[in-house]
Curated annotation (Swiss-Prot):
Gene3D superfamilies: Bira Bifunctional Protein, Domain 2, GAD-like domain, Nucleic acid-binding proteins. Pfam families: GAD, tRNA-synt_2, tRNA_anti-codon. It catalyses: tRNA(Asx) + L-aspartate + ATP = L-aspartyl-tRNA(Asx) + AMP + diphosphate. The record marks 30, 80 as: Important for tRNA non-discrimination. This is Aspartate--tRNA(Asp/Asn) ligase. It is an enzyme of class 6 (ligase). L-aspartate binds at residues 171, 217, 443, 483. One of its GO terms (cellular component) is cytoplasm. Keywords: Aminoacyl-tRNA synthetase, ATP-binding, Cytoplasm, Ligase, Nucleotide-binding, Protein biosynthesis. It is found in: Cytoplasm. InterPro entries: Aa-tRNA-synt_II (IPR004364), aa-tRNA-synth_II (IPR006195), aa-tRNA-synth_II/BPL/LPL (IPR045864), Asp-tRNA-ligase_1 (IPR004524), Asp-tRNA-ligase_1_N (IPR047089), Asp/Asn-tRNA-synth_IIb (IPR002312), AspRS_core (IPR047090), GAD-like_sf (IPR004115).
Amino acid sequence: MRTHFCGELNKDNIGQTVEIYGWVNRRRDHGGVIFLDMRDKHGIAQVVINPDNADFSLAETVRNEFVLKITGTIIARGEGLTNPKLSTGKIEIKAQNIEILNTSKPVPFQIDATDTSEEVRLRYRYLDLRSDTMQNRLRLRSRVTRYMREFMDEHDFLDIETPFLTKATPEGARDYLVPSRTHSGKFFALPQSPQLFKQLLMMSGFERYYQIVKCFRDEDLRADRQPEFTQLDVETSFMSENEIMTMMEKMTRGLFKLVINVDLGDNFPTITYADSMAKYGLDRPDMRISMQIVSIDKIMQGVDFKVFSGPANYDDSRVAALKVPNGASISRKNIDKYTKYVSIYGAKGLAYIKLNKNGPASPILKFLGDEVIAKVIEMTDAKTGDIIFFGADKSKIVNEALGNLREQLAKDLDLFDTQWAPIWVVDFPMFEVGDDGSLNTTHHPFTAPSVDAKTLEKTATTALSKAYDLVINGSEVGGGSIRIHQIDMQKTVLKLLGISDQEIQDKFGFFLNALEYGCPPHGGMAFGLDRLMMIMTGANSIRDVVAFPKTQTAACLLTDTPTSISRKLLRELSVKINLPEKD
């Protein structure tokens, strides 16, 4: 029977006989004595096996990652032999009995190696998860979800499960579809979120709901996205935006303090979407970076340089400047690198002015004139030694290009403040206008606008929504809104999205019917647990905080999925595969 965990042993246990279980983290032979570093979920303890031990010959066969049961006596390590890197570094276990519970093939990589490729780590994920890093991250994740549940319970929220097999609805990404065997030719969809069901729970009178739930989105993957992801989903009736934000802020503040001992401060600041885009180029501003984007349209409207004057005179375009402190030392080679970087976001170039000791220097000086240059320097508060980058194009392109350049420069030049920086982003546009003039919701079709239905029909392109996002260190960790609770408004929004009456009835009929039976005002929020964990642990990717993640191509290297399905099963599901022809 196990008496202690490896990592819990210390000087207080000296003289005690203990029984431990675990894996061989490392095996060493020194002067005829065998040393084993035994690892379990709490840490590592050193075991020493002397040649006179009856199990010495057995110990000689032991290799890394063998699973052992060891009985022995705790003794103090000799002078000069302690290991300050281990919590157990002042003691060791003098083995009495050794039992091999299981052997191990030679492992394809050292468990705690930092140079192992991600492909190998994911293919042998069960080995990768044995590392201290992954063990600690997943334990932290467990503490986070435990705190969330406790907070929700303390505030009278009910944990209610919602269906995974549900109806396909347009929520901004492609659905994962599940064919129905019993209803030939028909499909379920895996939920992109529990959105409609949690609203139905509010209509059912539960008032406060939460769930830590898996969601599924078939979309292009990035470093911070997975096809299946986990979120804390929250919905509540009879609360305003500010009341919901205050409660969720309280939970976030307590979570960071308890789990990683970070004080996020009281009263998170708030910024409007419009200000965030104007000053930071993105709707998830990283407030650890002091650099701001400055609009310079007015002073560029009359210049002869059409690259600037053109966008400066159009309503949907802008000319903006980004000052980089001490950036004049950036080499031409790196400026070319940044020019290529902003082209990813549609920018056609990256103009700049360096403020050297001898004055401004730039290929564009001759097009602007001294007065305009002086005004730009004044508006950006630039000093000798700085560099000013420019963006001039459609507002969307300029915002994305300079917003992402701002973050990249901060990484390259180490311009981050060390303090954590939470901020609420509010007053989002209700709709985004597509290139073809069609409307798309900025969040989802169930977000309440800040105006009534009649006004919304007239001002759809400028109307704001009652939505809010929580951003920490430039990452959106949560988002929510007040929901539409009146059927006329819901129909108006769906029609503005170009959805026909028949499609509205087919896809949302059940939901619209429920709105007619005394739906309370309600709202909510969802926290992306995976992204939150990435921020709290400092991981580079969500794949590093999920036990069994998918790759960037939505594949699982461990189980070699997705896989083909037998023809027999396809026939049972009434599914026919029609693959596109290869070029």
